Design a protein with these regions (language model features):
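Phosphate/pyrophosphate-binding loops at sites that engage ATP/ADP/AMP, CoA/4′-phosphopantetheine
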Residues: 93-101
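Active-site nucleophile and cofactor-binding loops and adjacent substrate-binding regions
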Residues: 5-6, 106, 130-138, 162-163
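Conserved ATP-utilizing enzyme core subdomain
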Residues: 2-86, 90, 152, 162, ...
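Conserved phosphate-binding/catalytic loops in two-lobed NTP-binding clefts
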Residues: 120-142
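Alpha-helix capping/hinge segments and adjacent helical runs
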Residues: 146-157
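Acidic-glycine-rich active-site phosphate/pyrophosphate-binding loop
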Residues: 62-69, 114-124
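Glycine-rich phosphate-binding loops at beta-strand->alpha-helix junctions
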Residues: 100-119
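Catalytic-loop motifs flanking and including active-site residues across diverse enzymes
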Residues: 8-13, 85, 115, 136-139, ...
Length: 176
């Protein structure tokens, strides 16, 4: 088993759409109205992170120190930033899932139909999207399950996913 971060998605899209006074780009309509900035797209797709082998992971710090400055130096309209970044996301997900027959997409990005269409364009996979309840509560369910494994002293952290030297049971238990 292997898992890894492919690329940042909502953290970037929402950051830029927030500057328009919106929480998110509903259905990706703003991004769809923009134009791809090819130079920025090439720079994003050439970042060293995408050349690394998994396991690998991303954090807010990397986005703030790498992605935002790269985008901000271009002084683009927000709709063009969103359009370019959606294309970047779709390319990266497509590249990372080329060998996958099925692709199960979860998270807030599933509500961005333009993003999903662009991912489908670059992916050879059959895309499945779960019910809204699963999308909204996925992380709570996963972390509850990881907590249960920890309480039972079972492995909840796989080295193939995290890059750790061995599988282990991670987390702290605090009792009242």
């Amino acid at each position: 088993r292997i898992a890894f971060d492919i690329c940042p998605v909502n953290i970037v899209l929402n950051y830029y759409v927030n500057s328009l006074g919106l929480e998110f780009d509903n259905e990706g309509l703003i991004a769809a109205s923009g134009t791809i900035h090819n130079e920025l797209l090439q720079e994003l797709n050439s970042l060293q992170f995408y050349k690394m082998n998994p396991p690998k992971s991303l954090g807010l710090e990397w986005v703030q120190s790498t992605i935002f400055p790269l985008i901000d130096q271009k002084n683009m309209d927000i709709k063009d930033v969103l359009r370019t970044f959606v294309e970047h996301i779709a390319i990266q997900i497509g590249n990372s899932t080329k060998k996958c027959k099925d692709l199960f997409i979860t998270g807030g990005g599933v509500f961005n139909s333009f993003l999903t269409q662009r991912i489908q364009q670059y992916s050879n996979s059959e895309i499945s999207i779960p019910e809204n309840q699963i999308v909204h509560f996925k992380e709570a369910l996963i972390f509850s399950f990881l907590g249960l494994l920890r309480i039972d002293n079972q492995v909840n952290c796989l080295s193939s996913v995290t890059g750790a030297t061995m599988d282990h049971s991670s987390g702290a238990i605090f009792l009242p």
